[in-house]
Design a protein with these regions (language model features):
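A short acidic-Thr-Gly-centered motif at the start of a beta-strand
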Residues: 1-5, 23-28, 221-225, 260-269, ...
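N-terminal glycine-rich phosphate/pyrophosphate-binding loop and immediately adjacent elements
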Residues: 2-119, 125, 277-279, 283, ...
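A glycine-rich dinucleotide-binding beta-alpha-beta segment and adjacent secondary-structure elements
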Residues: 7, 200-203, 238-241, 399-465, ...
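Glycine-rich loop(s) and the adjacent beta-strand/alpha-helix scaffold that form part
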Residues: 28, 32, 39-54, 226, ...
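Conserved redox-cofactor binding core of oxidoreductases
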Residues: 60, 123-236, 422-432
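FAD cofactor-binding and catalytic pocket of flavoenzymes
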Residues: 75-93, 101, 105, 110, ...
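Alpha-helix capping and helix-loop boundary segments enriched in small/acidic/polar residues
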Residues: 122, 210, 263, 299, ...
């Protein structure tokens, strides 16, 4: 099948937080760009059945796979919202669709403390600059706010209030967390005029009510409306090469157009002066490592693929007062055991469990610890893909687990009758970040060292944050995008 040839001033790969913010800032500057997204569009309508749910999973839950680690159901092969890639010691979940991971996430927007930030990014970025400019800008772009009091005190969010009450008894600080949620739509769910989604905790594969402020409906929609951004869904980028001559004056971006069952319908090549990689941790590492190891971009830094982190913690506790059978979401409350824990800072977010066993008083949490970025992606030529290696038995991870256990023990001791059913640092990571270390593989503005016109603007820049990473990804993307726009406008 012959490749069709195209030309674009700027090409963006991926439409998650990094790609969408870059697209919006380029559009505002009047710069034309093509955005390639491997997944489909997911328009939410009044029917309220756009996405699969945890209680009724189907092919929409997984990217071109008959299985998903999030369900035991056998799935039809479809271009669904989450790709699962097995690794050694750690598996990876990656978003797919126009809007990227914002479609199928908790929408949790946490800003790390100065100490947590220093642990992971302090050698590259100034926290004061991030705190005063880029975190507020990211919040404004996303449009996030904590759960309003009337929603929080409703019957649907009893589990969040129970968690907060237990934290108070244990003397563990907590706060309501900023969320990328339209609370007016949640109120409509509560009133019965929109399909029940967030209030039933049905948000893992997308939010059918439209309450999720996903990027395709917010800032990426603004970028498209400008007329400067051409979003091309179902476009799977397979390779990047230097343009003819390899003198650093541009890149070829090879990609396949597919249908919703994954069949290739046409092949394309776009040549561009500026290539912005925003394909997420998995996608960006996949493209760059493939380019280095196949000789397309052999001079990419040796640190490429390293410093991969996953700070995600999964816990479940039982023996509490009975909660509502369908727990309202997304996570409304964050425990911030950042200073009193002698073993290290721990964050815990109450996470809705839509089918928790009745009569047993379960609360589940997803949390974060500043676990060391010990993982690494490697290119496997037999698979023509990357594999994540994660040293699950490393002593540093055992220390992080001990910090989590300390927080949970305090909760159980302060709340007689409760107990921890399980706790572990996740082995299937939805918050895996890193592999393209900011300030090492790139400069501090996301420009790939030694490769003029090549940028990275997603979570692969970060080795971790100690809290769920989405807000930091967006804040760093806003910072990188300012330099990108300046470079394009100045032709530097």
């Amino acid at each position: 099948m012959e490749r069709q040839q195209h030309r674009a001033q700027v090409v963006i790969v991926g439409s998650g937080y990094g790609g969408s913010i870059a697209a919006l800032r380029l559009a505002e500057a009047g710069v034309d760009a093509v955005l390639l997204e491997r997944g489909r569009r997911w328009p939410v309508d009044d029917a309220g059945d756009t996405f699969a749910t945890q209680t009724a999973p189907d092919g929409r839950a997984a990217w071109l796979s008959k299985t998903s680690p999030l369900t035991d159901a056998k799935l039809d092969v479809y271009t669904g919202v989450l790709e699962f890639v097995p690794g050694s010691g750690m598996n990876v979940l990656a978003g797919a669709g126009v809007g990227g991971a914002s479609l199928a996430s908790n929408g949790t927007m946490c800003q790390p403390s100065a100490e947590l930030f220093a642990h992971t990014l302090g050698d590259v970025l100034d926290y004061r600059e991030m705190r005063e400019r880029w975190y507020p800008e990211a919040r404004a772009l996303i449009g996030c706010e904590p759960v309003p009091d009337d929603v929080y005190h409703s019957e649907f969010y009893r589990s969040a209030r129970s968690f907060a009450d237990q934290l108070d008894k244990a003397g563990i600080p907590w706060s309501k967390v900023d969320l990328a949620v339209d609370w007016d739509v949640v109120r409509q769910e509560m009133a019965g005029t929109r399909v029940r989604s967030q209030i039933d905790g049905l948000n893992v594969f997308g939010v059918n009510s439209g309450a999720q402020r996903s990027l395709d409906r917010t800032l990426l929609a603004r970028a498209e409306a400008s007329g400067h951004i051409d979003v091309r869904p179902l476009s799977v980028v397979t390779a990047v090469h230097p343009a003819d001559g390899g003198d650093g004056t541009g890149y070829h971006v090879d990609h396949d157009r597919i249908d919703e069952r994954g069949t290739v319908v046409s092949r394309h090549r776009i040549t561009t002066d500026r290539l912005v990689l925003a394909a997420g941790t998995l996608g960006t590492n996949r493209l760059l490592l493939r380019a280095r190891e196949t000789g397309a971009l052999p001079a990419l830094d040796a640190a490429l693929g390293t410093r991969v982190g996953n700070s995600e913690v999964i816990t479940a506790r039982t023996g509490m007062q009975e909660n509502n059978p369908r727990q309202g979401g997304p996570a409304a409350v964050i425990a911030q055991d950042w200073r009193e824990n002698p073993l290290g800072p721990v964050s815990l977010l109450n996470f809705p469990w839509p089918d928790a066993p009745e009569g047993e008083g379960w609360i589940t949490t997803i949390g974060s610890v500043p676990a060391p970025a010990l993982g690494a992606f490697h290119y496997d030529p037999d698979k023509d893909d990357v594999v994540l290696t994660w040293p699950a038995d490393d002593p540093a991870l055992a220390r992080a687990q001990s910090a989590i256990t300390h927080t949970l023990d305090r909760l159980d001791e302060a709340n007689p009758g409760s107990r921890t059913a399980f706790s572990r640092i996740g082995t299937t990571g939805g918050n895996v970040v890193g592999g393209v270390p900011l300030g090492t593989v790139t400069d501090d503005a996301g420009r790939v060292n030694g490769h003029h016109g090549l940028y990275v603007v997603d979570g692969s820049l970060l080795p971790g944050t100690g809290v769920p990473p989405a807000l930091t990804v967006a804040a760093v993307a806003a910072r990188v995008s300012e330099r990108l726009v300046s470079d394009v406008a100045g032709r530097s």
